[in-house]
């Protein structure tokens, strides 16, 4: 059984932790309660791969994003990793991944799945606040589809920023707080289409790009990219777009 690392005050919402912990093995079911996240994953991975390949140069040149392992050697922290849906593809791209989550069953499922997949990922049941008290830093820290579930966004981002090395990056993916996001992400996704279990999201916790950029600035991070993610019903999948009214991703750098 996963053992929790010692932690002080945290931004963790116990109700959300329990909700995601109950998903268990179904995290890895492409047709299960996390089906929408499975469909979103290729877009997230490509976005992260492309920006990190450009930023973390080798001998002064951008990395080849289409190489088998373009993220070779990069130390990445996946904060709020769930059962490892994002951590695993990043490890396959060559990254040395540390992935944390406060839900014990998530970490147990993630470890078993990584072992079956032959991947070495450092999974820890802990919080971002506890980890930020350590001396370690990372080339990139990810907060993907997690900010809308924490109680203190500014505090969470601040802890993420503390774990980014000078010259490193932070990435976040979340939901904008607009009428459009309420209609599509709450009413549509949870109550009409059933893409996510009802109660997964609280619209009041959604974060505007301006609010997120402000939180990043307070954490000594400078946002340099803001990209929307939209669902394409014709293709049945997600794609990058200029529209940030619902889902969006943001990248920020830390001064060298």
UniProtKB/Swiss-Prot annotation:
<dbReference type="GO" id="GO:0010420">
    <property type="term" value="F:polyprenyldihydroxybenzoate methyltransferase activity"/>
</dbReference>
<feature type="binding site">
    <location>
        <position position="144"/>
    </location>
    <ligand>
        <name>S-adenosyl-L-methionine</name>
    </ligand>
</feature>
<comment type="similarity">
    <text>Belongs to the methyltransferase superfamily. UbiG/COQ3 family.</text>
</comment>
<dbReference type="Pfam" id="PF13489">
    <property type="entry name" value="Methyltransf_23"/>
</dbReference>
<feature type="binding site">
    <location>
        <position position="101"/>
    </location>
    <ligand>
        <name>S-adenosyl-L-methionine</name>
    </ligand>
</feature>
<dbReference type="GO" id="GO:0102208">
    <property type="term" value="F:2-polyprenyl-6-hydroxyphenol methylase activity"/>
</dbReference>
<dbReference type="GO" id="GO:0061542">
    <property type="term" value="F:3-demethylubiquinol 3-O-methyltransferase activity"/>
</dbReference>
<keyword id="KW-0831">Ubiquinone biosynthesis</keyword>
<feature type="binding site">
    <location>
        <position position="80"/>
    </location>
    <ligand>
        <name>S-adenosyl-L-methionine</name>
    </ligand>
</feature>
<protein>
    <recommendedName>
        <fullName>Ubiquinone biosynthesis O-methyltransferase</fullName>
        <ecNumber>2.1.1.222</ecNumber>
        <ecNumber>2.1.1.64</ecNumber>
    </recommendedName>
</protein>
<dbReference type="GO" id="GO:0032259">
    <property type="term" value="P:methylation"/>
</dbReference>
<comment type="function">
    <text>O-methyltransferase that catalyzes the 2 O-methylation steps in the ubiquinone biosynthetic pathway.</text>
</comment>
<keyword id="KW-0949">S-adenosyl-L-methionine</keyword>
<comment type="pathway">
    <text>Cofactor biosynthesis; ubiquinone biosynthesis.</text>
</comment>
<dbReference type="InterPro" id="IPR029063">
    <property type="entry name" value="SAM-dependent_MTases_sf"/>
</dbReference>
<dbReference type="InterPro" id="IPR010233">
    <property type="entry name" value="UbiG_MeTrfase"/>
</dbReference>
<feature type="binding site">
    <location>
        <position position="44"/>
    </location>
    <ligand>
        <name>S-adenosyl-L-methionine</name>
    </ligand>
</feature>
<keyword id="KW-0808">Transferase</keyword>
<keyword id="KW-0489">Methyltransferase</keyword>
